């Protein structure tokens, strides 16, 4: 599939961000969109590592009017916004992902879950 960054288990944040840059480079996305996508990639990958034992699959795709970031892990547990006080570091990743993404989808199966975040290309062109 053109424009895909499909990778297998064990990917770390730095590699996921590098792959994301490589996949999006031919599409000449705005710096703002690239920054948002890289933030979402970092949050989803680090959450999978921190809370679910690691990434089992990673993909990033440039679609016509959006960028899709897909991260799978082995946990069936759904992400949730932590009730962390603002004085305590961390706990804001899922909220951040949902703020930056136009929409998110979660599918749960026998092997864990896949979270897909869709970021609008047109919303960041202004």
Residue ranges and their predicted role:
Residues 1-4, 49-126:
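Conserved beta-strand-loop-beta-strand hairpin that lines the nucleotide-binding pocket
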Residues 3-15:
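STAS-typified acidic loop motif
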Residues 7, 31-32, 80-81:
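Short, contiguous strand/loop micro-motifs
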Residues 8, 25-26, 51:
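Short, motif-level signal for alpha-helix interfacial/capping segments enriched in acidic residues
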Residues 14, 18-42:
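Conserved short strand/loop->alpha-helix "switch" segment adjacent to the catalytic nucleotide/phosphoryl-transfer site
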Residues 41-45, 49:
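Active-site rim helix/loop that mediates acceptor-substrate recognition in acyltransferases
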């Amino acid at each position: 599939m053109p424009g895909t960054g499909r990778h297998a288990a064990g990917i770390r944040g730095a590699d996921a961000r590098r792959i994301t840059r490589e996949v999006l480079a031919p599409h000449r996305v705005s710096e703002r969109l690239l920054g948002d996508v890289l933030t979402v990639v970092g949050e989803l990958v680090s959450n999978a590592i921190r809370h679910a034992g690691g990434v089992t699959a990673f993909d990033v795709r440039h679609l016509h009017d959006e960028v899709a970031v897909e991260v799978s892990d082995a946990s069936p547990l759904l992400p949730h916004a932590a009730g962390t006080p603002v004085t305590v570091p961390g706990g804001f990743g899922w909220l951040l992902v949902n703020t930056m993404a136009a929409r998110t989808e979660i599918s749960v199966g026998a092997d864990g879950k896949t979270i897909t975040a869709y970021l609008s290309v047109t919303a960041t062109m202004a």
